[in-house]
Amino acid sequence: MRLYIGSLLICVLLGIVPFATANTNRSGYEEHRNYLLNIFHNPLVNDSIKEKNIPELIAFYQRYPTDIPLSDADRQQFERFIHDYREYREVLVDGVPPQGGSFGNIFGHFLGRVGTRYISSLFNKKREEGQSNHANSPTTSPSRIQKMTK
């Protein structure tokens, strides 16, 4: 009987733990995504701040590689950017990695092509999720919008 109760308790715990961590991971995903969008999708943020947050963007990409839809070509370009960025950061000047400043060509290439598509995909996914959430909620439009549609 003890073995039966112990086995039942273990099964219940194994069923609860993944469920609880799934919600935690999802909220962490949303927080991280919103943080990155506030930096990379905001035209008021300057390039030096964006450069400082590239490691965060890379960490997000590697943690959630399939959550953002990218074409195979875009994914390969992003992987190449990560490789180039890490290679640049490994270069030592007097025994230490580079201490800030612009790394020009790599960052320019990233913002011009791959980064823009990745951030746009990240933003579009957020917008699609927001629209599906709004479609399911019975809220009314703000009064200024109601006046415009009448």
Curated annotation (Swiss-Prot):
<feature type="region of interest" description="Disordered">
    <location>
        <begin position="127"/>
        <end position="150"/>
    </location>
</feature>
<dbReference type="GO" id="GO:0009408">
    <property type="term" value="P:response to heat"/>
</dbReference>
<keyword id="KW-0391">Immunity</keyword>
<protein>
    <recommendedName>
        <fullName>Protein Turandot X1/X2</fullName>
    </recommendedName>
</protein>
<feature type="signal peptide">
    <location>
        <begin position="1"/>
        <end position="22"/>
    </location>
</feature>
<dbReference type="InterPro" id="IPR010825">
    <property type="entry name" value="Turandot"/>
</dbReference>
<feature type="compositionally biased region" description="Polar residues">
    <location>
        <begin position="132"/>
        <end position="150"/>
    </location>
</feature>
<comment type="function">
    <text>A humoral factor that may play a role in stress tolerance.</text>
</comment>
<keyword id="KW-0964">Secreted</keyword>
<dbReference type="GO" id="GO:0045087">
    <property type="term" value="P:innate immune response"/>
</dbReference>
<comment type="similarity">
    <text>Belongs to the Turandot family.</text>
</comment>
<dbReference type="GO" id="GO:0006979">
    <property type="term" value="P:response to oxidative stress"/>
</dbReference>
<dbReference type="GO" id="GO:0034605">
    <property type="term" value="P:cellular response to heat"/>
</dbReference>
<dbReference type="GO" id="GO:0034599">
    <property type="term" value="P:cellular response to oxidative stress"/>
</dbReference>
<dbReference type="Pfam" id="PF07240">
    <property type="entry name" value="Turandot"/>
</dbReference>
<dbReference type="GO" id="GO:0005615">
    <property type="term" value="C:extracellular space"/>
</dbReference>
<dbReference type="GO" id="GO:0009617">
    <property type="term" value="P:response to bacterium"/>
</dbReference>
<keyword id="KW-0399">Innate immunity</keyword>
<keyword id="KW-0732">Signal</keyword>
